[in-house]
Amino acid sequence: MVPLTFLRTKASRSLPIMLAALIFAGCGTQAPDQTAAHMQGSAQADSGFYLQQMSQSSNDTKTNWQLLAIRALLNEGKTQQAVDLYNQLPQELNNTQRGEQSLLAAELKIAQKEYPAAKKLLADIDTKALENNQQARYWQAVIAAEQGRPSLPLLRALIAQEPLLSGADKQKNIDTTWQALSSMTPEQSQALVINADENVLQGWLDLQQMWFNNRSDPKMLKAGITDWQTRYPQNPGAKMLPTQLVNVQNFQPASVSKIALLLPLNGQAAVFGRTIQQGFEAAKNGTTAVAGNAVPAQAAQAANVNDVISPSAVETSDLTSAQAPAQGTMQNPVTAPTTPPATTQAPAETAAPAEAQTPVVPQAAPATDAATAQPQTTTPDQQPAAQPQAVAATTANPGAELKIYDTSSQPLDQVLAQVQKDGASIVVGPLLKNNVEELMKSNTSLNVLALNQPEQVQNRANICYFALSPEDEARDAARHIHEQGKQAPLLLTPRSALGDRVATAFAQEWQQLGGNIVLQQKFGSTSELRAGVNGGSGIALTGSPVSASLPQQQGVTIGGLTIPAPPTDAQISGGGKVDAAYIVATPEEIAFIKPMIAMRNGSQSGVTLYASSRSAQGTAGPDFRLEMDGLQYSEIPMLAGSNPALMQQALSSVRNDYSLARLYAMGVDAWALANHFTQMRQVPGFELNGNTGDLTATQDCVINRKLSWLKYQQGQIVPAS
């Protein structure tokens, strides 16, 4: 029998162990506060997780989960849900929670695109009281509030944020810093005033100045980057170069000794292809006189014939499919001609171009049929003419081998195979959009300057896209109108696919610039417009939001069921909201539209009117110019007066058809772009002052054109700025 004293001793020894077990078991039933790791950013989850934790918690822990849920909803783009949850925050918050609340308030304003309000909230936040991850978010909010516009506050925010980041986020910060610097003009840079102790910023500005001085010379730019890294070894950009400058260091110029020009030379699109060909050859060969017309007389005269679509009324991007080849199509590539056949002499009534003291861009002979094509030769008396003043000059090169391939006579894959077999070093073209789509599917390794854009641009290291399209012009219009401080644009477009494409392109660019909703109003035929004038109805400055400009509202999910967000009010009245109207119309259409706007809204409506080059065809008489008083419209620099000699040559060769003259200028610029293909592809900020616009390239190597803007003023046409 075990003694009783032993049992008592054993029991007394076991009691503390049992009590401890009970205590620990009790602790296990209450989950530890997990919010700290999430608040500090070391742990992350989606809004659903945070909302669930919030519903199961209380007091400060519940508030922490609520703050985390708001942040997650913002990151997921669910702005309205984030606002609703933010408004439910309790009044009593501790210091840490209040700091997070202040930061979220600014982030919410940015998500709602209320940038001035966001800046005011950010200015009231003490950054020293924030945790490191909150400081990174704070500076990101400051960056976002600047809307990508290069400025001193933006640069300072990026520099302050950089030490708080690592890995890919740090590289993104450095790339964004360089993007801001490289998008400045020298004048903007010189206007910056910095403090003496801002050493990092001073280093960045010295890099920017070196880039300004050498961006047109890749060799000098490479040497300048190396020298800058030596002088500023501690600068973040010296330790981790911006991606664009890494590409500069790897720069290798592409050969343009053997060029393949891919164009439709038969069918409906032939008039476009031959005009571009003539402009391209003009720049290549350095000839100084127009030897003939790029298009048959009947095509150029179509603008004056009723019920016939003139080339001036058709956009190149509208020609999305090749036409059936006519008799005598080119089945083989032809060599660029120098003399026209006897059967293609210019009619007697065609005016010869006036002589210019210094032709700005050389002019080539016209295209010929395959049967009469002769090898390219250059006579000794043909001197290269002077080129337009540009950031990077492009000289004529008659010795370069040029072969022209007809994309309307055979499938594109066969054309590309022949081009590859012929050993071309660069391809210029194709022109038709469907051919560009086929080009993307081919995965060719050749360097290609496509003369149109596919629906979905793909970033290919060997492809650049150069389009002369209404969408391209609409994007430039969005930038111009935004630069003029306008905030609420209305688009007046044809009731057609063209009008919808223009509206989408404008709205997408407007969104990227930080703009709000874009309105669109569609108009019908000329007869409908005439009836509107006769009826005295006028045009109200109202419209429906373009879908591409609407913020994506997230639905609400309750119990597994997603309820769509309520629709946005489709009709928004002018009432002082619309401050700009962009009109895409022919001269005849705009002659009705502008008076109808004044009829309905008065001449002092305060709305600035803008128009595309579609309304400018060189036929504006004094009455038309007076009627259009105050209207701004875009035009390529050549037709805006920057290159009078080339303008005269181009218009003479296409019988004064302004749309074809623009394509002629496109051919001239295509030669310049082909000669600077690698620079456009690899050197950040590389720019050509072309005849179709100031040419720069996006990261996808889509060539942007900054157009000239003109204005009707008291019967005269003057620069808009």
Swiss-Prot record:
> Which residues lie in Low complexity bias regions?
331-393
Q: Its GO biological process terms?
A: peptidoglycan biosynthetic process; regulation of cell shape
Write down the SUPFAM superfamilies for this protein, in alphabetical order: Periplasmic binding protein-like I (SSF53822)
Q: How does it sit in the membrane?
A: Lipid-anchor
Source superkingdom: Bacteria
- Mind listing the UniProt keywords for this protein, alphabetically? Cell outer membrane, Cell shape, Lipoprotein, Membrane, Palmitate, Peptidoglycan synthesis, Signal
Q: Give the GO molecular function terms.
A: enzyme regulator activity
Q: Where in the cell is it found?
A: Cell outer membrane
- One Pfam family hit: LppC
List compositional bias (Polar residues) regions by residue number: 316-330
Q: Where is the lipid attached (S-diacylglycerol cysteine)?
A: 27
UniProt region (Disordered), positions on chain: 316-393
Mark the residues modified by lipid (N-palmitoyl cysteine): 27
Q: In the record, which residues are listed under signal peptide? A: 1-26
Report the protein's function: Regulator of peptidoglycan synthesis that is essential for the function of penicillin-binding protein 1A (PBP1a).
Protein family according to the UniProt entry: Belongs to the LpoA family.
Q: What is this protein called?
A: Penicillin-binding protein activator LpoA
According to its UniProt entry, this protein's organism is: Enterobacter sp. (strain 638)
